[in-house]
Amino acid sequence: GLPRVAVDLVAPPLVHPHSQVAAGAPKVVQFRMSIEEKKMVADDDGTTAQAMTFNGSVPGPTLVVHEGDYIELTLVNPATNSMPHNVDFHAATGALGGAGLTQVVPGQEAVLRFKADRSGTFVYHCAPAGMVPWHVVSGMNGALMVLPRDGLRDAAGAALAYDRVYTIGESDLYVPKAADGNYSDYPALASAYADTVAVMRTLTPSHAVFNGAVGALTGANALTAAVGESVLIIHSQANRDSRPHLIGGHGDWVWTTGKFANPPQLNMETWFIPGGSAAAALYTFKQPGTYAYLSHNLIEAMELGAAAQASVEGQWDDDLMTSVAAPGPA
């Protein structure tokens, strides 16, 4: 008897339109995700990886509901795919997060409904028996945000709001190399499996990236904002720990494990995301320019690719920073 609303998902880093404060009673929110197996380019050198994706993107799209709502997901595995797939929602209770009820072989679809009974940002990922790590690091992960019905709050209970929201999915890739030292290119998922798992077992990623590829969120693809705008960043890592840092900025309010029932930490320089979780960080930009948002494991950021940029427009505030003397002879 609850009202129903269908939501069209969008590809990261964007998030589908939503209200920050719930309007009315709980409802059933309907989503549809189609699984796509495809080859993706991992870096500027043209390195390829056989990927498995929700809706064709890495990470998959971010879903947003309010606490008390019901999520009704139709999961589609087209006949053009080769593998069985499912979905485990870390926000869900029972049946392996839904994985036990959503296993679909190519040509099948399943519908899962569960109650969003706690607020926060949560990871979801594919979890087929015997192949979980391979599917997860091959791209099948994303984030779900369950907002409190009255919106975000600080530790004192004052309302917090955001002007923009972006979602960043951090991935560790394990691309095998051929005997000549160059990265291998595989024609299909099955042909990549054994070599990829062998690299995975070294626990040494070939790439550590935001949103599927080196440079996916830099340059022309940078996040955008304006001075005075408050931006919420949802950052998920389905497999390994991460240490996000905004160079030239901060985390004004940070839910490091993403759970909005817990008070946010204030004025963070770097925050910690345990593998298998999603954090939420809110920052109001105070200066224009190009910011770097990266993992402060700097080797992963600068050598393996775990970095993004934010391009911020507006007027410079000399009170916050000024050049007293330009570089010159000593």
From Swiss-Prot:
Binding site for Cu cation 1: 85, 126, 135, 140
Annotated Cu cation 2 binding sites: 90, 125, 296
Free-text remark on how the cofactor is bound: Binds 1 Cu(2+) ion. The Cu(2+) ion is held by residues from each of 2 monomers of the trimer. Nitrite is bound to the Cu(2+) ion site. Pseudoazurin is the physiological electron donor for the Cu-NIR in vitro. Binds 1 Cu(+) ion. The Cu(+) ion is bound within a single monomer.
Keywords: Copper, FAD, Flavoprotein, Metal-binding, Nitrate assimilation, Oxidoreductase, Periplasm, Repeat
InterPro entries named in the record: Cu-oxidase-like_N (IPR011707), Cu-oxidase_2nd (IPR001117), Cu-oxidase_fam (IPR045087), Cupredoxin (IPR008972), NO2-reductase_Cu (IPR001287)
Main location: periplasm
Compartments, as annotated in UniProt: Periplasm
SUPFAM superfamilies per record: Cupredoxins
Family indicated by similarity: Belongs to the multicopper oxidase family.
UniProt name for this protein: Copper-containing nitrite reductase
